[in-house]
Amino acid sequence: MGPRFQPDDTLYKRRNTLKVEYVPDDIVGRDNEIEEYEAALQPIINGEYPDNIFIYGKTGVGKTAVTNFLLNELRESADHFEVDLTVISLNCDGLSTSYQAAISLVNNLRGHENHIAETGHPQSKVYRLLWNELNKLSGSVIIVLDEIDHITDDTFLYQITRADNNGYIDNIQLGVIGISNDSTFREQLDAKVQSSLCETEISFPPYGTEELQKVLEQRAEIAFHESALEDGVIPLCAALGRQDGGDARRAITLLRKAGDLARTENANSVTTDHVERAQEKLEAQQSMDIMRDLTEHEQLTLYALTTLAAEGETPARSRIVYQRYKELCEFQGREPRTARRMRSFLSDFEILNLTLSEMEHRGQDGGTYRQHELNRDIATVVDALQTIIGEFGAHQSIIEYLPDSGEEFATM
């Protein structure tokens, strides 16, 4: 018997080009944004002081891809024209405070063996170390702060964008590029930070269907063999990506998942049926991720509705859901949130497409009330809520949906 895993290049030429991390040789569908961005970076090649640039738009609209593409081009131009340029990139995901951001930037600038501890330093010392590290550099320095909206206070942004004005740096021309998924982040900043960080603002709108189709056609040409995709595959991926908010990452991932599904089935080509089934799987996984990321009391509210669904008692009125939610809380001695707060959780679930609700009218005397039901099958929700079920106990109604009939779970 031969090896279990065999090379397979029937469909793909370069599957990796359908990964989020891949930066293409050319960016399509973002001509206007690239033109604005390029103009803002041009002063660096001229030997002039760079502008600070604020980039904003939803996830998957090309902000990071365009930034990486243009910075690669900028480095090549700097090498060609012998311009002294250093680019420092910092992803701010997980850096909720200015203190954390400043330490991360210090450690980014220092060699790994010279990293400082993440806690225990006076703030003044951290910034002194930061200025010392920056002053070891020369020429133009660009600091890229991706997901900048994760930093919840302004101190770091104020310090870094006004370092030259405040006399902290004297050997470099410093520019900052801030990238945010939150279009309202700018309005939340202190006025001084706004004026410093947002010298140039570039908005990235969601991709339209035609733009997504161009993006997908570019990737497909590199990733797949000729004739590997049937007619209609790319238009369908683009249309579904547009429905998901014009998210190019999502559309590219969908195309890759459809290709993987076709390869698993030993198909000779990728069809629209593969796309539709891949979309169903992605939506299911997205729902799982959303449910697992809910807060404890949000999960308990969803758990309460799920037990009612398992009993065949949905659609259920808000007060019925609240009664079951209180029972779950009281079983573990937790203080329940108010009924009003729990109703806000239910409203959020509907926005997230986890549940459905409708207003019920019972005539003049019966009043009006809202009823709720799951928009996902019970087994999927139970699977996503296993941690909270393990902590609070398995309600009798959902035992059959648990692994091994709930043997490892305490019952209520």
From Swiss-Prot:
GO function term, MF aspect, one: ATP binding
Taxonomic placement: Archaea, Methanobacteriati, Methanobacteriota, Stenosarchaea group, Halobacteria
InterPro entries: AAA+_ATPase (IPR003593), AAA_22 (IPR049945), Cdc6_C (IPR015163), Cdc6_lid (IPR055237), ORC1/CDC6 (IPR050311), Orc1/Cdc6_arc (IPR014277), P-loop_NTPase (IPR027417), WH-like_DNA-bd_sf (IPR036388)
Binding locations of ATP: V61, G62, K63, T64, A65, Y207, R219
Cited function: Involved in regulation of DNA replication.
Transmembrane segments: none
HAMAP family per UniProt: ORC1_type_DNA_replic_protein (MF_01407)
SUPFAM superfamilies registered for this protein in UniProt: P-loop containing nucleoside triphosphate hydrolases (SSF52540), Winged helix' DNA-binding domain (SSF46785)
NCBIfam families found in the cross-reference section: orc1/cdc6 family replication initiation protein
Record keywords, A-Z: ATP-binding, DNA replication, Nucleotide-binding
A biological process term (GO) from this entry: DNA replication
Native organism: Haloarcula marismortui (strain ATCC 43049 / DSM 3752 / JCM 8966 / VKM B-1809)
Record flagged with keyword ATP-binding: yes
Protein name: ORC1-type DNA replication protein 2
Family: Belongs to the CDC6/cdc18 family.
